[in-house]
Amino acid sequence: MNIRIPNLCSALALLLSTGILQSCKDNDFSFDNIDATMGLGSEQLELPGNNDTKEIALDDVVNLNNSDFVYIDYNGDYQIKMDGNSQEKATVSIDPFTIKSSPTPAKKILISQGDFEGKLAVLTMSGTTPAEVEDLNSVTCDQNINVTIKVPNTVRCVDELTLSLPSFLLIDHATNDGANLSISNNTISLNNTVAGSHTMVLHVKSIDFKTSSNLGSTSFDKNNHRVRLTAEIYLKGRLSKNNIINRGNLSSISGNATADLTITAATGCFHPVFTFDSFGSVALNNIPDFLSDKSVNMNLYDPHIRLNFNNSLPIAAKVSGRMIARDAQNHAIATVDIPIFTVPTGKSVIVLHKQSETAPQGQTYVTVPGLGNLLKTIPDHIDFVDIKAKADNTQTTEVKLGHDYDMTEQYSFSTPLQLDADAAIAYTDSIDDLNKTVKKLSFKESTVGDPTSIDGSLELEADITNRLPTYLTLTAWGTNLQGDSIPQSQLSVDVDKTVDAASDTQTPATTHLTITIKPQSNDVLHSLEGLQFRFRAAASNGNNAIVGKTINAKKQTITVKNIKLTKTGKLVGNFN
């Protein structure tokens, strides 16, 4: 007599072969060449031979559940990619400041026939710099120094006058009473200057705080944010006899100078701070089943976080932050501190990654060893927060004062599905609706001891050829008609070993696997409605870790060969 046990053998074979895969009931690959007919009447019965499956690729059975962060690329590799929800922007500006002169008494220079000289005026100036200024090399002002010269009426005119100013003042043009003057090396020349008051306007292009001069000094006090400047205007003249009117009382030339310089640009070291609320967030929607089990440890081998920056500040910025993986209730699951990295001027790509390797041209790699912790437990979303972004105060450059400088940032998370040493992904599946078959079957009960005890079992054996770079571990348990788990003490489901991992697709690993299902009584057997399976795919079996291998949907397959189902004990069927 022959009976048919519908789907049991083929389902078990499928489940053995697809440790991280989707439900056997929902897939269309074939088990047509497996004979599922058993005979009754002996202590041991075996399924007839030649029971093999075709190669089963992951893509045949994995359901990505319309995931928006797991996809299969053109090469068949599984990829994880999440884009930030927005572009983040922060703006900095360093305020202009002024350097003003203090009132000083007018200077007088006695004149005489022939040559004469002396200090015509002294500018004493100071100002308060913005807090962002760390050091000053020079400032740009495009402002004027006004110099007044009074020539006494005891002369018709002064034949020659030259005014010398400190070399730290860059004076690019000058006028006297509106007429242009000759200027060379900060020396201004005038000829035939008539008696009376004259106003000279000296246009100051910039001030160099690193140049010394015997006609004055500059200083910058970083701690008190003060600049000070003293500039002497030194006059030399020549008066001929013919231009003297009153030889008895030649008197003197007098003068003073004033300035109110607004600084519009500066060269030096600065530390403006960009203020970001965050660098944004990435969400993980529609998590595939094989990543949703509580036992999943998604410690990826080398996750990459790509940060696209555009920094208009002409200074590189030192940036750091913290990434926090959170669950749906916004509770922190994992936190990773991001060390300081440099964002240069202009557009740049900074890639945070776990492994230490050389970056391709056009990118900068920053190694963050703990980056894999963010996905060990699959979060609802990942936030990039606690951003510190400050200009590098060791760089010397020119900045415009009162000008807005922007930094924009957008980040994405990407990595091939590659497991690190302690990583594991898991999947729970089931075979249901077994009761309509098993309730018709009974094992012969014991004639000694407990009359309800039985000595019978079903044993499934197969050779698993695995091309996946993961070790596959199966655990199983029964469920009753009420959907409750049946204790192992009543229905034991024993899997004898872990399926070995393949080191690469060209070198598959073959493991002989045995599953033994043993009910303790026929009552337990008759209450069996389903079998629950948990499959765990891990990078390590405790010793030999296989890391950094990309999981592939097309090339990495599993084949189940030499499937054998053995019944031990007398089996009684009631098919009335």
Predicted features along the sequence, with ranges:
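Extracellular/secretory-pathway and virion-surface proteins
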Residues: 24-576
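Bacterial Sec-dependent N-terminal signal peptides
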Residues: 1-37
